């Protein structure tokens, strides 16, 4: 006859509560950084701001959105650069995760932004949102991700996605060096 160790019910309840608090702690915010998808350089007459997505970029967005949802990703707010390629990426991503594209916020400061502008944009996220996604451009989005999580991502590729957990209750408490990097994914990453 086998021996079964008795585990006190209280210990199981505490362990379950601890596991739940890590995932759903109300004093945590989740920040996603999405670099715009691959853009087209076919029309040399277009200004940088107007460049559309390339066909590869259009194909990559649903793949990344599916991976995002497959990991249980949810976003309550999407803020993007007003550049055509960033807006198009945000809209395609939103459609693929059933986020209302009308709720996407265009922020001009995310075009040619630096870390401080990304930080400012994140600090103004609506308090009702526990998660937010910033859609922008390199090199700023990579620099911002590295500054937030004290990590060393060499380059967030086009349509690359970074997920970070922030130990804050209010978005205006966001600061560099305080995030935990949870995920770094991109289209060519083997799954």
Outline where the language-model segments fall:
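Active-site-proximal alpha-helix that buttresses catalytic centers in soluble enzyme cores
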Residues: 29-30, 34-108, 151-156, 191
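Short phosphate-binding loop-to-helix
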Residues: 110-124
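Non-DNA-binding regulatory cores of transcription-related proteins
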Residues: 125-133, 138-160
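Domain-level recognition of soluble alpha/beta enzyme cores
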Residues: 151-182
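Charged phosphate-binding loop/patch that engages nucleotide di/tri-phosphates or the phosphate backbone
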Residues: 180-191
């Amino acid at each position: 006859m086998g021996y079964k160790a008795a585990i006190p019910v209280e210990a199981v309840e505490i362990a379950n509560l601890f596991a739940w608090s890590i995932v759903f702690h109300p004093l945590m915010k989740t920040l996603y950084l999405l670099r715009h998808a691959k853009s087209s350089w076919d029309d040399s007459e277009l200004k940088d701001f107007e460049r559309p997505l390339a066909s590869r970029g259009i194909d990559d967005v649903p793949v990344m959105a599916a991976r995002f949802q497959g990991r249980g990703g949810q976003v309550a707010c999407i803020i993007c650069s007003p550049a055509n390629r960033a807006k198009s990426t945000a809209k395609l991503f939103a459609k693929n995760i059933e986020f209302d594209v009308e709720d996407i916020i265009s922020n001009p400061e995310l075009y040619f932004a630096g870390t401080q502008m990304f930080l400012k944009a994140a600090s103004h996220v609506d308090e009702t949102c526990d998660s937010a996604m910033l859609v922008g451009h390199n090199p700023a989005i990579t620099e911002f991700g590295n500054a937030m999580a004290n990590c060393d991502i060499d380059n967030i590729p086009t349509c690359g996605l970074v997920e970070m957990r922030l130990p804050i209750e209010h978005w205006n408490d966001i600061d560099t060096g305080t995030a935990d990097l949870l995920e770094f994914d991109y289209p060519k990453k083997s799954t």
